[in-house]
C-alpha cells in the first residue's frame, strides 16, 4: 500500500526538496492552499485536500482540514482491527506522515501595525488539530513541525522505509511543546487585551537561547531561555560584540546592571557590579569622568566586575578601562576606536550593546521568582518617585548639595541587597553595606568602607531604621544627612536622635527591599 503524507506549512523553507525526496521514495502527498501551489509550481505532484475530504476549502480557509477523512486517517490505530475496519467502512485512507507548521501568530502580533482582527485571523485551528492527532498516534504516525527535522526523517525513511519509534516519540513531544507554546502566546495576547491582571491560570512560554556549561555552581545544570515575545532591552536580546559566551552568573549580574542604569537617565552614569550589588556608581557631565568616579568608588571590588555605561563609550574612556580585568561591559554604543581598544588582547572580554531607548518598555514586564512547588509573580520595583513628595522630618532642612546627594543615594540604594545601606556624595558611591541580617551591621560596614571620605556625605537606607542606634552610629561617623522610607513604630526615636545631632533626615514613604 502506498504511504501518504499530508503537508501544510506556513514556513516553506526546505519543503520543496523534502517533498521531492518523499515522491522519490514512492509516497503520495496531500496538500493544502499555498503549500500545494508551491509544490505544484516546483513540479511535485500533490493531492488536493478537498479531493480527500469531499468538501471545498471554505470560509476564507478557516475550514479545510477539520474532517473525519483527515483525522480518521491520522488517529486510526494500526494495531486495532476495529479502527482499521472503521476506516475501511468509511472510505478513510490512512495518513502516515504529517508535516505542518502553524500560522505565524507570534510574528503577526509583533508587527507595529497589528490590529485585533488580524491577530485573530492568524490563530491556527486546523494545524494544531492535525499536529495533535498525529502526535497522539505517534505509535504509527510520524509528525514534523520543525524543518530542522526533515533530514532525520528522510534518512530513516530511505534506510528502513519508516521512522523508528524513538524518533516518532521525540517528534511527538516536540509537537506538544510547540502547540502548548503556541496556545500560551494566544492566551497571553487575549489576557492582555482584556486587561486581566490576575489570571487563574498562568502559562508563559520561553525559547531556548543558550545551553550553558553549568549554573550558579559547576554542580548545577542550567540553560538560558528567552521570552517568546522578546523584550528589546534585555540581556537575552543584547548584541554581543566580543568575548566568550555569557555564563549563568554573568547573565544574572548583567541583568541587575541594566536594571540599575535605567534609573540614571539625566546624566552620564557608570555602574559597576559584583554579585548583583552595585560596588561603584559614578555620575558626571561626561562618561569619562563618570567612569573615574565609579572606579574610585571601590578600586578593589571592580576586579572581575560588570560595568554598564549609559552613554556611548569613547576612546578616552576605553583607554582607562582597558587595563582593568572586567567580565562584561554594557553600553548603548561604542566608538570604533573604543571597540578597537577593548578587543586588543582581550578576546574573552564580553562586550554587549543594548538599545537604551527601549528601557521604558522593559519596566512593565513582570518578575517571576521560583520557589519549591510554586512561582511568585510581581511587578518590578519601578515606582515613579517625586522628591517634592518626600518629607523632611527633622528640624534641619537639607542644603542644596545635600538634597542632590540624597536623590543620588536614593536611586543607588534601590538595587542593594537588603538590609542595604549606601553612603554617597552628590556624584559617586563611597560605602556599601549589603545583605546583613541586621540594619546596624550594614551601617557599620558602609561606614568602615567610606571612612576616609566621609566629609560631605549622605546615607541612604532601603528600609526604615527599627532603632535609634543606627542614627547614633551615623552621627558618630560625621554623616549629616539621611534618606530612608520611614514607617517604623519607633520613627520618632530616630527623628529625636537625628535632631539631637543636628542631622537632616528625609522620609520617602517608599521601601526598596531586595532579596
From Swiss-Prot:
It holds the Pfam family MGS. Pathway: Purine metabolism; IMP biosynthesis via de novo pathway; 5-formamido-1-(5-phospho-D-ribosyl)imidazole-4-carboxamide from 5-amino-1-(5-phospho-D-ribosyl)imidazole-4-carboxamide (10-formyl THF route): step 1/1; Purine metabolism; IMP biosynthesis via de novo pathway; IMP from 5-formamido-1-(5-phospho-D-ribosyl)imidazole-4-carboxamide: step 1/1. Coiled coil: none annotated. Belongs to the PurH family. PROSITE patterns: MGS. Keywords: Hydrolase, Multifunctional enzyme, Purine biosynthesis, Transferase. Its EC number is 2.1.2.3, 3.5.4.10. GO terms for molecular function: IMP cyclohydrolase activity; phosphoribosylaminoimidazolecarboxamide formyltransferase activity. The keyword Transferase applies. One of its GO terms (cellular component) is cytosol. It catalyses: (6R)-10-formyltetrahydrofolate + 5-amino-1-(5-phospho-beta-D-ribosyl)imidazole-4-carboxamide = 5-formamido-1-(5-phospho-D-ribosyl)imidazole-4-carboxamide + (6S)-5,6,7,8-tetrahydrofolate; IMP + H2O = 5-formamido-1-(5-phospho-D-ribosyl)imidazole-4-carboxamide. It comes from Streptococcus pyogenes serotype M2 (strain MGAS10270). The keyword Transmembrane does not apply. The gene is purH. One of its GO terms (biological process) is 'de novo' IMP biosynthetic process. SUPFAM superfamilies: Cytidine deaminase-like, Methylglyoxal synthase-like. The IMP cyclohydrolase activity resides in the N-terminal region. Disulfide bonds: none annotated. This is Bifunctional purine biosynthesis protein PurH. Residues 1-145 form the MGS-like domain.
Amino acid at each position: 500500500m502506498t504511504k501518504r503524507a499530508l503537508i501544510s506549512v506556513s514556513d516553506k523553507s526546505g519543503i520543496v526538496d523534502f517533498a521531492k525526496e518523499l515522491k522519490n521514495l514512492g509516497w503520495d502527498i496531500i496538500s493544502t492552499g499555498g503549500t500545494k501551489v508551491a509544490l505544484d509550481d516546483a513540479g511535485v505532484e500533490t493531492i488536493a485536500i478537498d479531493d480527500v475530504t469531499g468538501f471545498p476549502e471554505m470560509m476564507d480557509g478557516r475550514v479545510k482540514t477539520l474532517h473525519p477523512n483527515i483525522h480518521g486517517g491520522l488517529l486510526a490505530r494500526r494495531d486495532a482491527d476495529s479502527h482499521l475496519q472503521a476506516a475501511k467502512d468509511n472510505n478513510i485512507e490512512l495518513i502516515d506522515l504529517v508535516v505542518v507548521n502553524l500560522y505565524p501568530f507570534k510574528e503577526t502580533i509583533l508587527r507595529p501595525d497589528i490590529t485585533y482582527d488580524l491577530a485573530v485571523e492568524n490563530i491556527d485551528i486546523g494545524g494544531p488539530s492535525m499536529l495533535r492527532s498525529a502526535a497522539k498516534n505517534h505509535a504509527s504516525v510520524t509528525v514534523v513541525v520543525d524543518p530542522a527535522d526533515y533530514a532525520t526523517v528522510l534518512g530513516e525513511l530511505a534506510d528502513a522505509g519508516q521512522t523508528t519509534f524513538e524518533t516518532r516519540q521525540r517528534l511527538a513531544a516536540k509537537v506538544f511543546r510547540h502547540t502548548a507554546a503556541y496556545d500560551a502566546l494566544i492566551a497571553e495576547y487575549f489576557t492582555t487585551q482584556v486587561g486581566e491582571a490576575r489570571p487563574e491560570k498562568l502559562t508563559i512560554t520561553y525559547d531556548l537561547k543558550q545551553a550553558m556549561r553549568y549554573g550558579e555552581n559547576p554542580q548545577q545544570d542550567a540553560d538560558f531561555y528567552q521570552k517568546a515575545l522578546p523584550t528589546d532591552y534585555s540581556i537575552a536580546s543584547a548584541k554581543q560584540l566580543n568575548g566568550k559566551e555569557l555564563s549563568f552568573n554573568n547573565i544574572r549580574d548583567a541583568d541587575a546592571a541594566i536594571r540599575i542604569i535605567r534609573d540614571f537617565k539625566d546624566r552620564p552614569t557608570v555602574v559597576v557590579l559584583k554579585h548583583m550589588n552595585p560596588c561603584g556608581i559614578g555620575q558626571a557631565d561626561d562618561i569619562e569622568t563618570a567612569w573615574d568616579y565609579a572606579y574610585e568608588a571601590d578600586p578593589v571590588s571592580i576586579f572581575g566586575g560588570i560595568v554598564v555605561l549609559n552613554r556611548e563609550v569613547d576612546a578616552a574612556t576605553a583607554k582607562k578601562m582597558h587595563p582593568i580585568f572586567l567580565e562584561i561591559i554594557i553600553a548603548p554604543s561604542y566608538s570604533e576606536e573604543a571597540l578597537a581598544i577593548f578587543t586588543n588582547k582581550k578576546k574573552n572580554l564580553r562586550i554587549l550593546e543594548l538599545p537604551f531607548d527601549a528601557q521604558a518598555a522593559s519596566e512593565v514586564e513582570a518578575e517571576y521568582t521560583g520557589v519549591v512547588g510554586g512561582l511568585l509573580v510581581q511587578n518590578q520595583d519601578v515606582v515613579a518617585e517625586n522628591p517634592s513628595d518626600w518629607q523632611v522630618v527633622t528640624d534641619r532642612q537639607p542644603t542644596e548639595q545635600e538634597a542632590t546627594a540624597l536623590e543620588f543615594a536614593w536611586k543607588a540604594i534601590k538595587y542593594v541587597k537588603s538590609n542595604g545601606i549606601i553612603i554617597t556624595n552628590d556624584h559617586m558611591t563611597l560605602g556599601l553595606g549589603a545583605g546583613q541580617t541586621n540594619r546596624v551591621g550594614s551601617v557599620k560596614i558602609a561606614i568602615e568602607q567610606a571612612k576616609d571620605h566621609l566629609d560631605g556625605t549622605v546615607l541612604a537606607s532601603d528600609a526604615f531604621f527599627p532603632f535609634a542606634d543606627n542614627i547614633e552610629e551615623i552621627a558618630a561617623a560625621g554623616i549629616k544627612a539621611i534618606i530612608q522610607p520611614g514607617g517604623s513604630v519607633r520613627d520618632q526615636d530616630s527623628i529625636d536622635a537625628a535632631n539631637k545631632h543636628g542631622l537632616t533626615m528625609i522620609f520617602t514613604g517608599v521601601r526598596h527591599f531586595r532579596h
